[in-house]
From Swiss-Prot:
Function: Converts heme B (protoheme IX) to heme O by substitution of the vinyl group on carbon 2 of heme B porphyrin ring with a hydroxyethyl farnesyl side group.
InterPro entries: Protohaem_IX_farnesylTrfase, UbiA_prenyltransferase, UbiA_prenylTrfase_CS, UbiA_sf
EC number: 2.5.1.141
Gene transcribed to yield this protein: ctaB
Pfam families tied to this protein: UbiA (PF01040)
Protein name (record): Protoheme IX farnesyltransferase
Annotated GO CC locations: plasma membrane
Top EC category: transferase
Length: 308
């Protein structure tokens, strides 16, 4: 796996980029997406233990099956996405070195590998309960079929559709413990669903020309920056009431969530009239990453000593 390989990046600058088999594997499964979704999966699972007064340490089998199963179905879905999108990935700077584009991994190999990972993930989730596996199926179906194969290349609402799948992980974590979806779990789902839209719209502004070259109808490509900026502000505003539904976690979490929401909204409004749209989009994108990490990690930390 440590064998060094060579990738020719000839389409843009003719330079040679060295990659390893391990690096190719991480790119194939989109390891960044796997990691970020595991944070929200773990948070959903942790809070399910918290609200049900169950022991975390006494249910390590559920913890391991949930995290392993979630990792596998997310990674498998990403591999299938790489397989399907290899024709447009070669047209975009940030995706053109993926192994499905460079030929490091053959399309058929990627497809079957993605299917295998996803199947193994479902088996792992079934070891917790049927509900968790069912929720996982909704996430996979939405991402692979409704987003990747149907809406991504056709409609500007592709971001909204894709955000459904990205909001599923905390529900997987929650249902793996409780077997049903509680109010707090739906709040986590809504936070993740709404959060993704301004997050990815900010990225779409930064990568507008790449999306245009690949003929992907992202909102800034079709309707321009002004419409996209307004949509970002509107979706951030929709986050404002959600922390108040997490009162069961304590006042500090409600305050933290509210402060994070206000901070993001203020950043958006202050920079809304900025002539440097790329600087503004970068600020919004970076803030969104910090928002997710801080808020979801804090929900675990603030309840850390209340779970056995």
């Amino acid at each position: 796996m440590a064998e060094t390989r060579i990738t020719a990046d000839t389409a843009m600058n003719g330079q040679i980029e060295e990659t390893t088999a391990w690096k190719d594997f991480l790119a194939l499964i989109k390891v960044g997406i796997v990691y970020s979704n595991l944070i929200t999966t773990f948070t959903g699972m942790w809070l399910a233990f918290y609200f049900s007064n169950l022991s975390f340490l006494g249910n390590l089998d559920i913890v391991l099956f949930t995290l392993a199963g979630s990792s596998l179905i997310i990674a498998g879905s990403c591999v299938i996405n790489n397989f399907y999108d290899r024709d447009i990935d070669q047209l975009m700077q940030r995706t053109r070195t993926r192994p499905t584009v460079t030929g490091k991994i053959q399309p058929s190999q990627a497809l079957w590998f993605g299917i295998l990972l996803t199947a193994l993930g479902f088996i792992m989730l079934l070891m917790t309960n049927l509900t968790a596996a069912g929720v996982g199926f909704v996430g996979v179906f939405t991402y692979v079929f409704l987003y990747t194969m149907w809406s991504k290349r056709r409609y500007t609402v592709n971001t909204i559709i894709g955000s459904v799948s990205g909001a599923v992980p905390p529900l997987i974590g929650w249902t793996a413990v409780q077997g049903s979806i509680g109010v707090e779990a739906w709040v986590l789902f809504l936070i993740m669903f709404i959060w993704q839209i301004p997050h990815f719209l900010a990225l779409a502004i930064k990568k507008t020309e790449e999306y245009r070259a690949a003929n992907i109808p992202m909102l800034p490509v079709v309707h321009g920056f002004e419409v996209t900026k307004r949509q970002i502000i509107i979706w951030i505003a929709c986050l404002m009431p959600l922390p108040f539904f997490l009162g069961g976690l304590g006042l500090p979490i409600v305050i933290l969530g509210t402060v994070l929401n206000i901070g993001w909204l203020v950043c958006g409004l202050v920079g809304y009239r900025s002539k440097n749209i790329m600087k503004w989009a970068t600020l919004m994108f970076v803030y969104s990453l910090n928002y997710l990490t801080i808020f979801f990690v804090a929900m675990v930390v603030f309840t850390l000593f209340k779970i056995g």
